[in-house]
């Protein structure tokens, strides 16, 4: 089962006065539907899930499901380095109607490849909705190897992987081993077209928080044979995408949204305001891309 093709936004969580700003969240969700975003990924890394309480995460996920109301798929971040906690959250998410769950590798524990498989198998066996694996070694210190991914493909609910290793040798090996057994999403906004060329079907995107149409268009154009047009957008966006990762995500994207008047509020500690020199780089990149896109 394919959850979605195209651009799924790794959604920020708007805050106000220290709480989730549900009025702003509703506005953002409806805007994404209008802009052509293909899926919503809520309470992931970009959504600052790690600094939210369990109650806040549940309220935010349920609000998103209710607001979207089946217009596009909603995928909830339910991962944890505690397998039982991931199972509990995934079962709850299934019960309130999410279309799928995004489950990160169990960070910090530094388990083995066997442990990775057993972790995902336990989650797989506890639910009956699609699972998107999330491989991001730069954050977790743990990498899903191609051979482990091949084993994970045999789990009945594992349908896709968000691949953010940036290791294209590994991506080629994954595709060679797994072929069409699993859908492949880019976890890196600067590598969407290269990943699509390896048979990927989309991106789970940070940049889509401010550029939903562009990220959708990259995927849509490429998958409809207009590869040069897709590549042009990808290359035109390179500087602004790089600026969105000049500091730890989601610091720059949330800053960029506020600079654009989207009023998504502050970051929660230990995330903090940008360094002044990096903020200037971000401002310049946003301004330069706006000029380029207006002239196009």
Swiss-Prot record:
Binding annotation for pyruvate: 46, 204
Sequence similarity: Belongs to the DapA family.
Catalyzed chemical reaction(s): L-aspartate 4-semialdehyde + pyruvate = (2S,4S)-4-hydroxy-2,3,4,5-tetrahydrodipicolinate + H2O + H(+)
Species in which this protein is naturally found: Clostridium novyi (strain NT)
Pfam families: DHDPS (PF00701)
Record site: Part of a proton relay during catalysis: 45, 108
EC number: 4.3.3.7
Name under which the protein is recorded: 4-hydroxy-tetrahydrodipicolinate synthase
Function: Catalyzes the condensation of (S)-aspartate-beta-semialdehyde [(S)-ASA] and pyruvate to 4-hydroxy-tetrahydrodipicolinate (HTPA).
Subunit field text: Homotetramer; dimer of dimers.
Cellular location(s): Cytoplasm
Catalytic residue list: 134 (proton donor/acceptor), 162 (schiff-base intermediate with substrate)
Gene name linked to the record: dapA
Biological process according to GO: diaminopimelate biosynthetic process; lysine biosynthetic process via diaminopimelate
GO cellular component, one term: cytosol
Biological or metabolic pathway of the protein: Amino-acid biosynthesis; L-lysine biosynthesis via DAP pathway; (S)-tetrahydrodipicolinate from L-aspartate: step 3/4
